[in-house]
Curated annotation (Swiss-Prot):
InterPro entries: MMgT. Residues 1-3, 64-131 are cytoplasmic. The keyword RNA-binding does not apply. It comes from the Eukaryota. One of its GO terms (molecular function) is inorganic cation transmembrane transporter activity. Residues 23-43 are lumenal. Component of the ER membrane protein complex (EMC). GO terms for biological process: copper ion transport; magnesium ion transport; protein insertion into ER membrane by stop-transfer membrane-anchor sequence; tail-anchored membrane protein insertion into ER membrane. Belongs to the membrane magnesium transporter (TC 1.A.67) family. GO terms for cellular component: early endosome; early endosome membrane; EMC complex; endoplasmic reticulum membrane; Golgi apparatus; Golgi membrane; membrane; plasma membrane. Its main location: endoplasmic reticulum. The gene is MMGT1. It comes from Homo sapiens. Signal peptide: none annotated. This is ER membrane protein complex subunit 5.
Length: 131
C-alpha cells in the first residue's frame, strides 16, 4: 500500500491517543469536583486508548519498512576477511611513537633544549622569591 496511507494511519492513531488523554484528564477533573476520586476510568476511554495505541503501532511498523535478518550471515557474506575487522575510525596517528622512535641525534638535542629551558625557568622563579 502507499506510504501516505500508513502515515495517515499513524496520524489518526496519535490524534486518537491525544483525545483519549484529554478525555481521561477531563474525567479526572470531573471526579474531583463531584468528590468521587476512587472510581476508575470509563471503559470507553480505556478501549479508545488501547485501540489508538494498536493503530499507531501498526502504522509505525509499516512505515519502518523491511526488517533486517537477525542472523549476521546475510550482511557478512558481502565482506572479505580483510575488511571484516578493519575499523579505520580507530586509527590514531597522534601518539608517542614519534618521540620514542625518533633518531637519537634529534632526541638528545631536544632533551638538552628542554633541560636548559627548565633550569632557566627555575632560576627566574628563585630570583622572584629573593626580591
Amino acid at each position: 500500500m502507499a506510504p501516505s496511507l500508513w502515515k495517515g494511519l499513524v496520524g489518526i492513531g496519535l490524534f486518537a491517543l491525544a483525545h483519549a488523554a484529554f478525555s481521561a484528564a477531563q474525567h479526572r477533573s470531573y471526579m474531583r469536583l463531584t468528590e468521587k476520586e476512587d472510581e476508575s476510568l470509563p471503559i470507553d476511554i480505556v478501549l479508545q486508548t488501547l485501540l489508538a495505541f494498536a493503530v499507531t503501532c501498526y502504522g509505525i511498523v509499516h512505515i519502518a519498512g523491511e526488517f533486517k535478518d537477525m542472523d549476521a550471515t546475510s550482511e557478512l557474506k558481502n565482506k572479505t576477511f580483510d575488511t571484516l575487522r578493519n575499523h579505520p575510525s580507530f586509527y590514531v596517528f597522534n601518539h608517542r611513537g614519534r618521540v620514542l622512535f625518533r633518531p637519537s641525534d634529534t632526541a638528545n638535542s631536544s632533551n638538552q633544549d628542554a633541560l636548559s629551558s627548565n633550569t632557566s625557568l627555575k632560576l627566574r622563579k628563585l630570583e622572584s622569591l629573593r626580591r
